[in-house]
UniProtKB/Swiss-Prot annotation:
This is Broad specificity amino-acid racemase YgeA. Optimum pH is 8.5 with L-homoserine as substrate. InterPro entries: Asp/Glu/hydantoin_racemase, Asp/Glu_race, Asp/Glu_racemase_AS_1, Asp/Glu_racemase_AS_2, Asp_race. It comes from the Bacteria. Substrate binds at residues 10, 52, 83-85, 198-199. The active site is at 83 (proton donor), 197 (proton acceptor). GO terms for molecular function: amino-acid racemase activity. NCBIfam families: asp_race, PRK10200.1. The gene is ygeA. Belongs to the aspartate/glutamate racemases family. Amino-acid racemase able to utilize a broad range of substrates. Highest activity is observed with L-homoserine and D-homoserine. Has tenfold lower activity against L-methionine, L-leucine, L-valine and L-histidine. Has low activity with L-norvaline, L-asparagine, D-methionine, L-aminobutyric acid, L-isoleucine, L-serine, L-norleucine, L-alanine, L-glutamine, LL-diaminopimelic acid and L-phenylalanine. Has no activity against ten L-amino acids (Thr, Glu, Asp, Arg, Lys, Tyr, Trp, Orn, Cit and Aad).
Length: 230
């Protein structure tokens, strides 16, 4: 079994499922008392979020690249960045850390393609929904077209993520709002929905979505397990 290095804490609420899902995956594959060989570097999300708001992406890239190097020195054999949004600086991490980097959009793209879909809704932070680092990769590498919410909906979802979910607050009102947005995007032709923020899967259960759900945290964790046992 390879040792996986997790870059977490963005937010820590969604890092917990990564640890659980990876361990469950190893147990299912190997049985008995087997558990995952995991190293975790959990950053202070306050600093990361401030950099996001200020547009200081180079600084966040430096922080995460240094964290990845620390995991490499500690014995990690691959890197999993436990957040969708911070894949905006994936290149900065990969340019300085020589370990295999398991990109969350690639794992998600393979899952969508495997389900025979080419047109999906995307919910996430405004950075993930509006910028090209995530949607563009899905389009270029997997020919997947992402439908995103309207501007006011994007602002509301971003507010829910940062002011509620990242603080461990999960309300029925926000759950219903996200389900309503998903239903509207289904009417526009979306075949499935990407929970492109690792916290959204903590808010909206699959049964509340009219579309098949691609929970990126779960998909990414499965990809990590496959890598660890390869």
């Amino acid at each position: 079994m390879k040792t996986i290095g997790l870059l977490g804490g963005m937010s820590w609420e969604s890092t917990i499922p990564y640890y659980r899902l990876i361990n469950e995956g190893i147990k299912q594959r190997l049985g008995g008392l087997h558990s995952a060989q995991v190293l975790l570097h959990s950053v202070d999300f306050h600093e990361i979020e401030e950099c996001q708001r200020r547009g200081e992406w180079d600084k966040t890239g430096d922080i995460l690249a240094e964290a990845a190097l620390g995991l490499q020195r500690a014995g990690a054999e691959g890197i999993v960045l436990c957040t969708n949004t911070m894949h905006k600086v994936a290149d900065a991490i990969e340019s300085r850390c020589t370990l295999p980097f398991l990109h969350i959009a690639d794992a998600t793209g393979r899952a969508i393609t495997g389900a025979g879909m080419t047109r999906v809704a995307l919910l996430g932070t405004r950075y993930t929904m509006e910028q090209d680092f995530y949607r563009g990769r899905l389009t270029e590498q997997f020919s997947i077209n992402c439908l995103i919410p309207e501007a006011d909906e994007r602002a509301k979802i971003n507010q829910i993520i940062f002011e509620e979910l990242c603080l461990g607050q999960f309300t029925e009102a926000s759950r219903a709002y996200c389900a309503q947005v998903i239903a509207r995007l289904a009417e526009q032709g979306a075949q499935g929905v990407i929970f492109g923020c690792t916290e959204i899967g903590l808010l909206v259960p699959e049964e509340r979505s009219v579309l098949p759900v691609f929970d990126t945290a779960a998909i990414h964790a499965e990809d990590a397990v496959a890598f660890m046992l390869s």
